[in-house]
From Swiss-Prot:
Record protein name field: Uncharacterized protein C4orf50
Organism: Homo sapiens
Lineage: Eukaryota, Metazoa, Chordata, Craniata, Vertebrata
InterPro entries in alphabetical order: DUF4527
Compositional bias segments (type: Polar residues): 1163-1172, 1220-1230
Bias (Basic and acidic residues): 868-881, 1204-1215
Pfam family, one: DUF4527
Superkingdom per UniProt: Eukaryota
Coiled-coil region: 149-267, 972-1034, 1271-1302
Keywords recorded for this protein, A-Z: Coiled coil
């Protein structure tokens, strides 16, 4: 053999395996070396030995059989050495196989680690998905909370708007409450009544509905249970009609109830209007009654005054108690006053009884009234102020009414009226030549307001004039109004302002202690602690307003009641102004204008103007009578009427005692609730103090005092009258108060009553004297009638006697004066005495004329009152001209108009005596006066008689009115109870208003908290959005990394599987080549043995034939043998050619033909006789070309290292075939040479040749025996290898089953993930709809959600993994798309559900597929179609040798290698999409993986089994 051939007898196989790991890629190099030179080594050695033996035999013919035996033994040793080498190489190959198995196990472990890593990544991805779902849930909840918060915010805004509107409405209602408070009360009662009626109606209707339902149920039950018939249908129809009629009747009843409710409301309004009119009428009757009483009492008082002035001229001394006894006899009982406050009545009685114990009035510095004390402020000797001490402030009202109860506390002073009593007088020595002290009433009110804690009962003495009796009588004082003094008044103001009330002590007027006989009259002043306070008296309305705002108390809640009395106050003010004009025209001292001034004060904030009450010259009992009568006449009306009475009594300042606590507690609101609407200028000092001294001089003071007393007495009486009018106005919400009941007066049918009411109205408004009928007695219980007829008649006789006696005395005086001579001393004394008597008489005459003038005023009063009433009706009440006649009317013979009246000076002249003519003129004037007085006496007696008749008639009328009043009082009490109930309702409404305000504040607080919460939620939402974005980014990054890792793992798994498949194919090819080489060698050896046997037989025949030849021919034969040596060589080549071609065709026929076809580029028949062998054992040319094309076409898909390995294998196969061919040719060429040499040897030495042949036969038999043993050993080894492979196959099948079990939950998770994704998409869609519906759409969020919803891969997975059937996948796929799909979707392949579905679908078909389908499946690999006849005749070995690994289509590759068909899925007409993440491609790859796992058993099968 050639050296080149010897160098290439050993073939090396190198494999580079790259496996992925955590650190990158593990590269493993596998080198397999196979030495094939041992196969034909022994044949070469035997050929050399034969040549040597032939040469030796040719050279030494005597060579024996021992050398041949040694050669055979050496050849046997070589064969055994070759066999040992073969065994050694086989053991090395076995060890290499073990190494490959270990590497395979490592690769499988690596695959397991990768799958574990994939599972971990999948779990991490699932956790990320769960977190994402949780965040989406939180986002959804936050969105819901935000929507709820926004809805709540919208509701809060709406509530705020509603509350704002409600606040506006409440403000309007608060403004309207002052105007229509009583309307709301009435409406509340009506609403409650309506509610009650409606509730009854609703209950009745509910009962009817329940009855109807029960009837309908019974009817339906009867309808269901009754047999079909005309009678049942008729009854059912009748019942239905009855039910319908009942329902209509119920509806009609409801409508009638609504109409009746409206009618009831209208009727109630009408009745309330009639009731208000009746109240006005009753009020007018009451005024008429009180006016008549005042007229009667005034007449009696005038008669008493006339009797006192015109009586006998008795010496003036201390006044007795007769006048007070008259008061006691004329007083009436006061059961109401005693019932209201028996303690006060007892104190009053005790104070009136103080004449029995005059010195015990003020022991230990206290008054006998108990806790009530007096403080004394005396600026000089000109004035004294009596005020209650601080103990009296502790007495609080016992019974509170309405909401005023809550506003009175112990710390606040009482808000009742202050009674200011101004008593003015002068001593006898100062009353004629000293001006009266001025006291500013507004200043007094200011001081009172500045010290509201002190009870204001002021007894201001501006002069030291006695209060009773004429001049020179210290026992009787004359009360006067305060007069203006420019300097002393200012001093008193300063001193009173700087002094604080001293500690309580019992003080009184300076003259009280000296006149204890007047204790009863004086004790009346000590009743002042029972009089209510009034701390709101100031000089100006602004001061009043400031006082009220700073420390007033509860006036703000009470000013509502004053608005209804505005008209009344205005009318009273107008009348007060009229009366002021009339009083100024007469130069009267009056404070009636204080009513209008008080109403002006009340316009600003409801303050009251200070009034002053004065007493006429006479007894204090007469002064106290109208004051106390005002209390007695009202005390019968109950606490409600008393409370209203005190509202008007605030206009007048006077002594008022014995009031109950109910009267005290509600007085201030009435006092300050007059005429808020009037806009009058603040009255000046001249208006406030109408008691200025006019131009008529000091001589008219008595007349002024008289008329002021009359006006103030009527004011005091009118204070007790006007409260009833105010009481009636509390019940008239829509009716404007017309002032003291005048509106109801014209409606009376009796003209006399009408006139009397007009007169009373005018008297009540202007303050003309209407004296009360009753006055308290000393004991406080027994009233009498002033107008008793006997007393009047007695007074008439006394008046007549007094005038006659006066005339006689005057005449006697003048006669005595006439006897006196001028110039004598006695004349002077008599003249001075006469002057004193004349001055005394002038005073008496002045008083008498004063009564006459007041009587003349009363005569003109009826006409003026009628004119006043007419002027009020015609709207001319404001004109002062209507009432000036009342004050300007003069009586003939008025002393003010008598000639030379001012000549009678107040003081007796101190100069020389007047002439006698003056005395005559005085005498004549006195005579005229006496005649005038007589005429007046007759006129007065006539008028008295008429008045007595009128008094009797009026008395009867008064009794009827009293009875009527009692009835009306019951009605009033009932109305008052309704009023209290309505007040409670108003308080309830106020509480509800407070609750509403509290609810509003709570809602505002809740709104603020909600805003804060919303801001916090928005911030948290933004934070969560940021976290969600970061999480999404991290999730996408992890998913991307996972996908990249999965792609890498899939690619590495694919490469690993490709390498494993290539290794298996290479190993099978190697084993097959080895087996084929051994078989060829055995065939060649068996043929050689047969040839040797034939040659042995030929040689034996030749030996037998040539034994007879001679020795001579031996030399010639030897030469001939040497000459034909070359020819033997050629002959040997010719003889060996068929065997060589056969061996070549067997040993390396297919590879050689493949190499020849690859080299030549075409197919053709091979040389020699190999065509017959090729027809049976090798594939046809088309198949070879096809396999070659497939290998060439698929080499492009393999990596560069694999391509190099394939080329290296091909290059190694070529020299192996050539070497084998050369060995076969050399071994076969030895046969003819040996035969020729043996023929010559036979010819030379037949025996020797026979022995050699026999030895050779034995050797060959031994060799055959050894080769059989070796063949048997190789078969055993092949069987063992097959068993090992079968065990490995079983292990792989177990691993496949485990992989299936591991893959099953992953597939279920994929399906569940698909379902969750669908649910997530639905939730996102719902959330987007909710956001758009609430107006919270976000474009970025909508686009993001739309991108998530438009996931094509998710839609395909949904259609694939959640479909009821599994679609069949088409195999018409390109390799690149399959690889990409395998890389991108390996995590979604291992679905147990899909695996079970695939197994069920695959089990429905048989594994072998029809032969016509197989070429169609492989048509994409080659454009040439394989004939059906050739498919069944394919040799698996040749197919395995010709096919390379195709990574993308393992199923088709395995079909070509082993001829095993694989199952194919049915096409479901689902076109494979072009996306790389197509589920169809994933399913196809999944199917191929399963087929590759199932076909592992075919890959590892033994080549002997493949042949079998």
């Amino acid at each position: 053999m050639e050296p080149t051939a010897k160098g290439r007898t050993e073939e090396s196989f190198s494999y580079v395996i790259r496996a992925p790991s955590s650190e990158g890629f593990d590269i493993m190099n596998v080198d397999v070396k196979i030495d094939t030179s041992w196969i034909f080594q022994d044949m070469e050695d035997s050929a050399e030995e034969r040549e040597c033996l032939q040469e030796e035999a040719a050279g030494r013919p005597d060579m024996d059989m021992g050398a041949l035996r040694r050669q055979l033994e050496s050849s046997e040793q070589k064969l055994s050495a070759a066999e040992d080498k073969y065994v050694t190489s086989e053991s090395g190959l076995r060890s290499r196989i073990q190494e490959l198995e270990l590497s395979e196990r490592k690769l499988l472990r690596k695959v397991d680690q990768l799958s574990t890593h994939v599972a971990q990544e999948r779990s991490a991805w699932l956790q990320a998905q769960e977190k994402l779902a949780a965040l989406q849930g939180e986002l959804a909840s936050q969105i819901r909370e935000e929507s709820v918060a926004r809805r709540q915010q919208w509701r809060l805004r709406r509530l705020q708007e509603r509350l704002r509107r409600k606040d506006e409405a409440l403000g309007q209602q608060a403004a309207a409450l002052e105007r229509c408070r009583r309307t709301q009360r009435r409406q509340l009662g009506l609403v409650r009544e309506q509610e009650r009626v409606l509730r009854e109606q609703v209950q009745r209707l509910e009962r009817n509905v329940r009855r109807l339902c029960r009837a309908a149920g019974l009817l339906l039950a009867q309808w269901d249970t009754a047999a079909p018939g005309s009678q049942g249908a008729t009854e059912a129809a009748a019942e239905l009609r009855a039910l319908q009629a009942r329902a209509e009747r119920s509806e009609r009843e409801r409508e009638e109830a609504a109409r009746s409710l409206q009618e009831h409301r209208a009727t109630e309004r009408q009745l309330r209007g009639q009731l208000e009119e009746l109240r006005c009428c009753i009020y007018g009757l009451k005024l008429s009654e009180i006016g008549l009483q005042g007229q009667v009492e005034d007449l009696a008082q005038q008669n008493q005054c006339l009797r006192e002035e015109l009586g006998a001229q008795a010496p003036i001394g201390h006044c007795s108690l007769d006048a007070l006894g008259c008061v006691q006899g004329d007083s009436l009982p006061l059961p109401r006053e005693e019932a209201l406050d028996p303690c006060r009545s007892q104190d009053w009685r005790n104070s009136l009884r103080s004449n029995d114990a005059p010195r015990q009035r003020a022991p230990a510095g206290q008054s006998p009234e108990g806790p009530c004390t007096w403080s004394r402020i005396r600026p000089g000797r000109a004035s004294s102020v009596l005020a209650p001490g601080p103990e009296t402030t502790s007495e609080l009202p016992r019974d509170l009414a309405g909401s005023n109860r809550e506003q009175l506390t112990l710390a606040e002073p009482s808000l009742d009226e202050q009674i200011l009593l101004l008593v003015c007088g002068c001593p006898p020595e100062e009353c004629l030549d000293e001006s009266l002290l001025r006291m500013d009433l507004a200043w007094i009110s200011e001081n009172l307001a500045a010290d509201p804690a002190a009870e204001a009962f002021l007894l201001v003495q501006t002069s030291a004039l006695p209060l009773w009796g004429p001049a020179g009588d210290s026992a009787s004082w004359r009360p006067l109004l305060l007069q203006e003094v420019p300097s002393d008044g200012q001093k008193i103001q300063e001193e009173l302002a700087t002094r604080s009330p001293p500690p309580p002590k019992a003080t009184g007027h300076p003259g009280w202690d000296c006149h204890q006989t007047r204790g009863r009259g004086a004790s009346l002043f000590h009743e002042a602690p029972y009089i209510s306070n009034h701390p709101f008296l100031k000089k100006h309305p602004k001061d009043l307003k400031d006082t009220w705002n700073n420390g007033g108390g509860s006036l703000a809640g009470r000013t509502e009641e004053g608005k209804a009395r505005g008209t009344l106050g205005r009318k009273g003010k107008n009348l007060g102004d009229k009366y002021q004009l009339s009083q100024e025209s007469h130069q009267n001292l009056s404070l009636e204008n204080g009513a209008g001034a008080a109403e002006d004060v009340q316009d600003q904030n409801g303050a009251s103007e200070t009034k002053a009450a004065t007493c006429r010259p006479g007894s204090w009992q007469e002064f106290l009578m109208p004051l106390l009568q005002g209390e007695a006449s009202v005390s019968k009306e109950g606490p409600e009427s008393l409370s209203r009475r005190e509202r008007v009594e605030g206009y007048v300042w006077g002594l008022r005692g014995g009031l109950s606590s109910e009267n005290e507690e509600v007085a201030p609101p009435a006092t300050f609730s007059r005429a808020h609407e009037t806009k009058e200028p603040w009255p000046t000092d001249s208006q406030l103090l109408a008691g200025k001294v006019r131009a008529t001089g000091r001589t008219a003071r008595g007349k002024e005092e008289n008329q002021v007393w009359l006006g103030n007495a009527l004011l005091l009486q009118g204070g007790s009258l006007e409260d009833k009018g105010l009481e009636e106005e509390d019940e008239m919400p829509h009716q404007e108060a017309s002032g003291l009941g005048c509106r109801g007066a014209p409606e009376e049918p009796d003209s006399q009553e009408h006139e009397s009411k007009e007169m009373l109205f005018f008297a009540g408004e202007t303050g003309l004297p209407l004296f009360p009928r009753f006055a308290l007695s000393v004991e406080g219980a027994e009233p009498t009638d002033h107008g008793h007829p006997q007393a009047v008649s007695k007074g008439h006789n006394r008046c007549a006697l007094t005038i006659d006696e006066l005339a006689q005395d005057v005449e006697a005086c003048f006669q005595q004066l006439s006897t006196l001579q001028p110039g004598s001393r006695g004349w002077q004394c008599s003249a001075s005495a006469c002057r004193g008597e004349n001055w005394s008489f002038a005073q008496k005459w002045h008083s008498g004329w004063e009564r006459a003038h007041s009587q003349q005023v009363w005569g003109n009063w009826g006409i003026c009152s009628n004119e006043e009433a007419k002027s009020k009706e015609s709207g001319e009440g404001d004109k002062p001209g209507k009432t000036t006649a009342l004050g300007t009317s003069e009586v003939p013979g008025n002393p003010g108009t008598l000639p030379h009246w001012d000549e009678a000076s107040p003081n007796p002249p101190q100069g020389p005596a007047e002439p006698w003519g003056a005395l005559e003129r005085v005498r004549s004037r006195f005579h005229q006066l006496i005649s005038g007085l007589k005429k007046q006496r007759s006129q007065i007696l006539h008028d008295n008689t008429k008045l007595h008749g009128d008094q009797e008639r009026f008395h009867e009328r008064v009794c009827a009115l009293e009875r009527e009043r009692e009835r009306e009082v019951t009605k009033i009490s009932r109305l008052e109870r309704d009023n209290h109930r309505l007040v409670g309702d108003i308080s309830q409404l106020k509480k509800e208003l407070d609750q509403y305000l509290q609810a509003i504040s709570d809602l505002e607080d809740c709104n603020g908290k909600s805003y804060c919460k919303i801001l916090e939620l928005e911030e948290e939402n933004e934070t969560l959005k940021g976290n969600l974005g970061q999480l999404q980014k991290a999730t996408s990054e992890s998913v991307r990394k996972s996908k990249d890792t999965m792609e890498q793992v899939t690619l590495e798994n694919w490469k690993l599987q490709t390498l494993i498949s290539e290794l298996g194919v290479s190993y099978k090819e190697l084993i097959k080549d080895i087996v084929l080489g051994i078989e060829d060698m055995i065939r060649a050896l068996s043929g050689e043995n047969e040839h040797l046997l034939r040659r042995v037989h030929v040689l034996e025949r030749e030996v037998t034939l040539q034994r007879s030849t001679d020795q001579g021919r031996l030399v010639r034969g030897r030469e001939h043998l040497q000459g034909k040596a070359k020819m033997h060589a050629l002959d040997k080549e010719v003889q060996v050619t068929p065997l060589t071609g056969q061996l070549l065709s067997r040993a390396c026929g297919p590879p050689l033909e493949e190499e020849m076809s690859l080299a030549a580029g075409q197919t053709g028949p091979s040389t020699g006789t190999g065509n017959s062998r090729r027809g049976a054992d090798s594939p046809p040319p088309s198949l070879v070309w096809r396999n070659t094309g497939v290998a060439n076409a698929l080499q492009g898909n393999v990596s560069g290292a694999e391509v190099k390995e394939a080329h290296l294998e091909k290059e190694e196969k070529r020299p192996r075939c050539s070497v084998a061919q050369g060995q076969a040719l050399s071994s076969l060429s030895n046969g003819p040479m040996l035969r020729d040499s043996e023929a010559e040897v036979t010819e030379e030495d037949p025996r020797l040749r026979a022995q050699q042949l026999h030895h050779r036969v034995l050797t060959l038999q031994c060799q055959l025996r050894d080769q059989g043993a070796a063949h048997q050993a190789s078969l055993d080894e092949a069987t063992r290898l097959q068993e090992e492979l079968q065990a490995k196959l079983e292990e792989l099948q177990k691993k496949q089953h485990e992989a299936k079990l591991a893959v099953t939950p992953l597939k279920a998770k994929i399906a569940s993930l698909v379902r969750k994704c669908r649910e997530r998409n639905r939730l996102i869609t719902h959330l987007l709809q909710e956001l758009h519906r609430h107006g919270l759409g976000n474009l970025l969020l909508s686009e993001l959600a739309q991108n998530m919803l438009n996931d094509v891969a998710l839609a395909e997975y949904t259609a694939t993994f959640l479909a009821p059937g599994v679609p069949e996948t088409s195999h018409h796929l390109d390799v690149k798309s399959e690889m990409t799909a395998a890389l991108r979707a390996q995590t979604y392949l291992l679905n147990p559900e899909m695996d079970s579905v695939l197994q069920s679908s695959l089990s429905s078909e048989s594994w072998p597929i029809p032969e016509p389908e197989w070429p169609a499946q492989t048509a994409q690999l080659d454009s040439l179609k394989l004939p059906l006849s050739l498919v069944s005749t394919l040799d698996p070995g040749t197919c395995l040798a010709a096919v390379t690994v195709e990574p993308g289509l393992p199923a088709q590759r395995l079909q070509e290698k082993g001829g095993m068909p694989c199952p194919a899925l049915q096409v479901d007409n689902v076109p494979a999409p072009s996306e790389l993440l197509s589920p169809a491609r994933i399913l196809a790859f999944h199917q191929e993986l399963r087929q590759s796992i199932c076909s592992n058993s075919q890959v590892h099968k033994s080549p002997l089994e493949l042949e079998m």
